[in-house]
Amino acid sequence: MRIAILWTELSGYLNACLKELAGRPGVELFVGHQVSSQDAPFALSQFEWIENRLMWRDQRSLRGIATRLKEFNPDVLVFSGWHVRGYRDAARAFKGKAWRVMTMDNCWLGTLKQMLAVIAAPAFPRPLADAVWVSGERQAVFARKLRFEQRVILNGLYSCDSSAFHAARLERIADGNTRELKFLFVGRLAREKGIRVLAQAYSAYRARVSAPWPLICCGTGSMETVLDGQPGIEMTGFIQPSELPRLMSSAACLVLPSDFEPWAVVVHEAACAGLPVLASNRVGSAIHLVQPGYNGYLFDSQDTEGLAGLMQAMTEMSEPNWRKMSDASFQLSHQYSTERWADILLEGYSMAMSADSSSR
């Protein structure tokens, strides 16, 4: 089976999923993707195993993809959204020739732009794809509004490198399963990630407790100066995927105060590593991976005092209660895995082919 994956920027977690897919019997991959951005400078060496690959920087450098796809002749064409013209053209070109799957992580927010997309859906983007692959239920709501029937909606678009983070958790358990007294933030240091709220909440939290935990901040971006130099905050810069499991295992809680976050794979990474999670109500993956009082807590994205209070509660939590939350996160993490990611795509294709045969 020949599968073409047309993505935006590759990441460590997608790399793990692609390796799982490529390892399945009879699967041959072609991957088209945009070069990495400065805010997420993933080492290109980790993707060198992909033999059939096309990297592009802009629409001009994407022109060669039509020829490459024609030569590859995919049975399955997975493409990222409808915003890349070259991918839209490819989807149209392979109508009736390949099973076309559009990926989507946009939550339904009811914005004017989304409402216009719903009105236009029968003409665009619905005809571009035979199925849509969404990250979760908030995205499935949008997909249904775009005229995708439930039978052609695939879930579980994203998974972290689940085995690597599970292994980090096991290492911590082998060392006594004690929590490292640190908060952890992982993400781009950008306005939509709630960086200012994070800085203010952490400062308020430090004023409330006698022995505050440090806050480890991993990432780069335009708002680095908001955090850098603040008491108790340690800046690491961008962390490569191979280093992140170890970092997760050396913290006690993930904090994610995003103001705009369609999904956030880092929540799955934290859950796999057995970390409780404090996430804003704008984090798309939280609806599936954070159960308030069970493995973490939710807060309004602009509620600085609310976040400070939750950080205080986490600091004052007993070790046995922290372990319960840690175990709960691990249990919730099993909703997604690299194995399941590959299964979803291959099972979806099999069902689509069976339905097509039955209709003839």
Regions found by a protein language model. Give the residues of each.
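Nucleotide-activated donor-binding/catalytic signature segment of Leloir-type glycosyltransferases, i.e.
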Residues: 225-242
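Conserved donor-binding/catalytic core segment of Leloir-type glycosyltransferases
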Residues: 174-193, 199-203
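A short, histidine- and acid-enriched strand-loop-helix "catalytic/donor-clamping" loop
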Residues: 99-116, 128-131
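Donor nucleotide-sugar binding/catalytic pocket of nucleotide-sugar-dependent glycosyltransferases
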Residues: 128-178
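Conserved acidic donor-binding segment of nucleotide-sugar-dependent glycosyltransferases
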Residues: 237-238, 292-293, 297-304, 312-319
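Short alpha-helical donor nucleotide-sugar binding micro-motif in glycosyltransferases
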Residues: 238-239, 246-251
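Short hydrophobic beta-strand element within catalytic cores of glycosyltransferases
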Residues: 276-280
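Aromatic "clamp/platform" in nucleotide-sugar-dependent glycosyltransferases that forms part
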Residues: 259
